[in-house]
From Swiss-Prot:
Similarity comment: Belongs to the universal ribosomal protein uS8 family.
Function field: One of the primary rRNA binding proteins, it binds directly to 16S rRNA central domain where it helps coordinate assembly of the platform of the 30S subunit.
Protein species of origin: Clostridium acetobutylicum (strain ATCC 824 / DSM 792 / JCM 1419 / IAM 19013 / LMG 5710 / NBRC 13948 / NRRL B-527 / VKM B-1787 / 2291 / W)
Annotated Gene Ontology cellular component terms: ribonucleoprotein complex; ribosome
InterPro entries: Ribosomal_uS8, Ribosomal_uS8_CS, Ribosomal_uS8_sf
Record carries keyword Ribosomal protein: yes
Gene3D superfamilies, per database record: 3.30.1370.30, 3.30.1490.10
Stated name of the protein: Small ribosomal subunit protein uS8
Amino acid sequence: MVMTDPIADLLTRIRNANVVRHGVVELPSSKIKKAMANILLQEGYLKDIEEYNDGVVPMLRLSMKYGKGKERIVTGLKRISKPGLRVYCRKEEIPKVLNGLGIAIISTSKGIVTDKEARKLGLGGEVLCYVW
């Protein structure tokens, strides 16, 4: 089966695991998924990332992070720019998610960065998703 939107697949797997409070999510690896997972790790939404090869395709194993009593750390994920409707922003238009409580993940000419890093670098780009 051909996957038309691997970023939406990543977000959906994380969202579904979060809802049922699974400890680990496994998915096929790619550069963009790895970069997004690293951002989620740096921002404190994931506990750990592991890359392994199952013999057929490289895989990512994401360890979910929960608070006390399995309280969810990730309360929401939303795909913004989709294959059918790309959403771009200039450096002046970089969105703030929940007035700074969440993050926007943006694909720029310097790679995939958070909204805060994009503002610091003075770069715009494609708004991939919001996480809060």
